[in-house]
């Protein structure tokens, strides 16, 4: 396994110390962390599933909710970490780059990106315009920005169209906050987070900033070309700035995100001192609510998104092309690539209150995606190498620029309608669908049906059916002249048809949800090997099924417990996914402080060694803890330990030959002081 070169800190002592601190207090009043009881949690609004306010008991979907109070107590910093506490979700760190933390829902992830999950922030889509994934545009989304998180498992195309394939993540951001937080920790972690809100001239403004930098952790990896051990690191830095303005029914939002990393892996290859990448996302949105029909609330949203991704890598080792280049050169084949895309979205939606028992939602959405740049400068000929044309021309240090994408565009129009009705006091019906029309691809209709029955005061039953599709992205279709990965212009939609049956039990101190699901995939888009390179294709029909359990328990006035478990029967193509996952969270809250211990588990997975064989990676538990103390005058201290036991957890690669998988970071310690004013 990869060796992690970090000092063996006394994690057990740290954990025991925190436990002793917890047991030493006998305060009678609860801190705000437990202000929201399990019974109250059942009535937290859920809006991402139907575009109307539902609750956990009535929403026609498999949903997990995290409120601000719950997020505050977790020993986690980023969205991809928290998703490990959701049934059916799991994370994967791959070798695309040092920031490549991706996630999947219900065992479906065919590339190094989360193409099958849609990410919404305040109702706006932020998936990458050209590659279709949210984890590229926002690889490390800070939890500090989130007021409420809704994680929906299952198809969402009946409302959102393509990419809402196996899940939808709906983030509602924090508003009207004033705070400043400073943190320092392992790998010289330096972090600043701040909120500011102000009312000026009738406009309410909300500002957020997140700035982060660390020196990275040292790892011993196998060199991608020689196979010999090398020492590398994964330093990173990030800047996120959000500004939201609102006056009455009018809203404007502007977001900027930038992230950088170097060394480690880049596009599955090592190259210390050369590997580097940086990405930049701009997102601006305007929304206006109004009434133009009786009993109907309407909204228009116009958004624009621009994304840049620049990276440098070695394609071959020094000397590899010495006998196959003209003029002959022993220089490594390096590439300096730039990818960029932009998207426009316009949505017109309506919520019609028909009567006391029923409502209808309908609307239209137009989207235009364009790959505005896809080129790379290299010192050898990309085209000749990609097509096996030897000798390959050598251009020296100046290099030559080659296209690596078709710089095409893709547009679609979607029409959706949904009908909600209380058939009787205990039965709620959801019926809807959406038709999407594409310029270059066949149209697709995605239906949904949901029945929610309140069996009694304790139990409720949900029977759900939905279909979703995912259109091939501009990157999957148009990637060219790439010796590592190339596109397939003949790809078609992939389709999933899903059944869910969910039983919920709710008692005064206990919430329990047990669900079973079945997915049937038609024309699934797969990543396959052609020699050592990869490409995409529509594969044969596949099926998966599973069980998801979520349990929350208030043990006493101060103690609470939450746990999840997932078991899935997955197709052979999902060898990179864990068939079993689980998590637990133990929390103790008192008047001034809070202590939390959480852990998540991922079963064995496989990483590809040859086009026809895989290597099994060990399963692992990851444990985190956090202790918070609230001083007077709004000051708060947070001590956090991630990966308490320094577990050497590895996750699967996309390319061949990485016997040990991709290493994750070891133990990380940090201290943070926050001032709320």
Feature names for model-found ranges:
Residues 125-153:
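Short acidic/polar hinge/loop motifs at secondary-structure boundaries
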Residues 273-291, 339, 404-410, 460, ...:
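Outer-membrane beta-barrel signature, preferentially recognizing the C-terminal barrel domain
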Residues 158, 170, 183, 195-277, ...:
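Periplasmic-side early beta-strands and strand-to-turn transitions of outer-membrane beta-barrels
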Residues 45-64, 80, 84-125:
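Extracytoplasmic beta-strand/coil segments of soluble accessory domains associated
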Residues 14, 197-199, 235, 239-241, ...:
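Conserved C-terminal beta-signal and adjacent last beta-strands/turns
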Residues 27-72:
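Short, acidic, small-residue-rich periplasmic hinge/interaction motif at the N-terminus
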Residues 244-260, 279-441, 454, 510-516, ...:
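Face-selective signature of the C-terminal outer-membrane beta-barrel domain
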Residues 422-429, 516-521, 537-609, 640:
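Gram-negative outer-membrane beta-barrel transporters
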